[in-house]
């Protein structure tokens, strides 16, 4: 931190100092203002779920953990980073937002007041291994893949705790680097118009498989894709039977690139060649919680409130079934000009099918209509 020029920024209720740099990637301590929406969504969620002891495992400037302490009911907030520059900056940023005296010993500084804030200088895996079954909520927001932290996070969270997991390595999850996806996520990705949803379902699926090793199941609270990152919040369920029930929600996708038609197969192993997965085929949201999140977001002072509300409202209204039809991609395949998305949705609903927009694609439609009915509808109207 010696001779480092700092500037102050505000996000939500938090004020923090960040290193002045030409780009965020040149900074010795990483802060990405584009991820403010990501942090808004978790702030909204924690206001509904009320976890008491929370960990921001990869804190950098400390912005996420500081917002947890300022904007949620959490009583004990841990901020951690392996970088010494980050550790020193986190201490300054905590004191910029809270009164009191930091007590420091061996790479750990603690501020006790209305809330307890612990600033930790260590490898995230070592901290989580040390704090076995301790945290009610753990947020993993790494630069790239979260996979090297997932095992220890599952052991560090309470057996009915909550995990928030971000993946920013879109190229593997979207099928541009399929071997990297197979190595990291143990799944075959699907390239093309469905890749954002398939990538999200691969991420949830691998969390489910890792959890099952520890006799844990999962319920998905919310999983979504936004701005080149994949995000999943899951609640852990204790017991081998819960793990077994969770694994039953895994399966595979068969996709015909010539037509845009897809088929789903539930089961731990595929029965046919050219299967994509395994992926999570269960729900991507808890409808009651997401509905509460919309109302909660309206009452909070968020950094990107308009964007947060738009995203949450769309997910709230979205049909929660696997995959969708992309009207532009199918139009190109059929060599026809398709109508506006809303017109197609109305035509499907008039025939008695469920149909909604999807946040995964501005030209996508989720519907209960079979592929043949969907094609007939877009040709007819």
From Swiss-Prot:
This is tRNA (guanine(26)-N(2))-dimethyltransferase. It catalyses: guanosine(26) in tRNA + 2 S-adenosyl-L-methionine = N(2)-dimethylguanosine(26) in tRNA + 2 S-adenosyl-L-homocysteine + 2 H(+). Dimethylates a single guanine residue at position 26 of a number of tRNAs using S-adenosyl-L-methionine as donor of the methyl groups. GO terms for biological process: tRNA N2-guanine methylation. It comes from the Archaea. SUPFAM superfamilies: S-adenosyl-L-methionine-dependent methyltransferases. Residues 7-378 form the Trm1 methyltransferase domain. Pfam families: TRM (PF02005). Its EC number is 2.1.1.216. HAMAP family: tRNA_dimethyltr_TRM1 (MF_00290). Keywords: Methyltransferase, RNA-binding, S-adenosyl-L-methionine, Transferase, tRNA processing, tRNA-binding. One of its GO terms (molecular function) is tRNA binding. Belongs to the class I-like SAM-binding methyltransferase superfamily. Trm1 family.
């Amino acid at each position: 931190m010696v001779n480092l020029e700092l500037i102050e920024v505000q996000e939500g209720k938090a004020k923090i100092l960040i290193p002045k740099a030409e780009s965020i990637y040149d900074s010795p301590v990483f802060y990405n203002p584009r991820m403010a929406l990501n942090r808004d969504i978790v702030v909204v969620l924690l206001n509904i779920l009320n976890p008491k002891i929370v960990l921001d495992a990869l804190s950098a400037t400390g912005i996420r953990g500081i917002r947890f302490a300022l904007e949620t009911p959490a009583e004990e907030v841990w901020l951690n980073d392996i970088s010494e520059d980050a550790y020193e900056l986190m201490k300054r940023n905590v004191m910029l937002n809270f009164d009191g005296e930091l007590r420091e010993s061996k790479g750990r500084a603690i501020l006790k007041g209305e809330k307890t804030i612990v600033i930790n200088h260590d490898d995230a895996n070592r901290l989580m291994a040390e704090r076995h079954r301790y945290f009610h909520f753990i947020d993993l927001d790494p630069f790239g893949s979260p996979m090297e932290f997932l095992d220890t996070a599952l052991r560090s969270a309470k057996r009915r705790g909550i995990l928030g997991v971000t993946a920013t390595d879109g190229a593997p999850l979207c099928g541009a680097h399929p071997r990297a996806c197979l190595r990291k996520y143990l799944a075959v990705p699907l390239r093309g118009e469905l890749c954002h949803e398939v990538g999200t379902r691969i991420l949830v699926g691998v969390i489910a498989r890792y959890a099952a090793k520890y006799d844990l199941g999962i319920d998905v609270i919310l999983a979504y894709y936004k701005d080149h990152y994949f995000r999943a919040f899951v609640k852990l369920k204790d017991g081998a039977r819960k793990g077994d029930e969770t694994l039953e929600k895994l399966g595979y996708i068969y996709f015909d690139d010539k037509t845009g038609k897809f088929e789903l197969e539930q089961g731990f192993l595929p029965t046919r060649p050219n299967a994509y997965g395994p992926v999570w085929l269960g729900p991507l949201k808890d409808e009651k919680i997401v509905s509460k999140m919309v109302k909660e977001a309206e009452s909070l002072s968020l950094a990107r409130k308009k964007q947060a509300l738009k995203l949450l409202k769309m997910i709230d209204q979205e049909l929660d079934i696997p995959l969708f039809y992309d009207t532009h991609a199918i139009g190109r395949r059929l060599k026809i000009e398709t109508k506006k998305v809303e017109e197609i949705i109305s035509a499907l609903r008039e025939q008695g099918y469920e149909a909604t927009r999807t946040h995964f694609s501005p030209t996508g439609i989720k519907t209960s209509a079979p592929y043949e009915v969907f094609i007939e509808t877009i040709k007819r109207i």
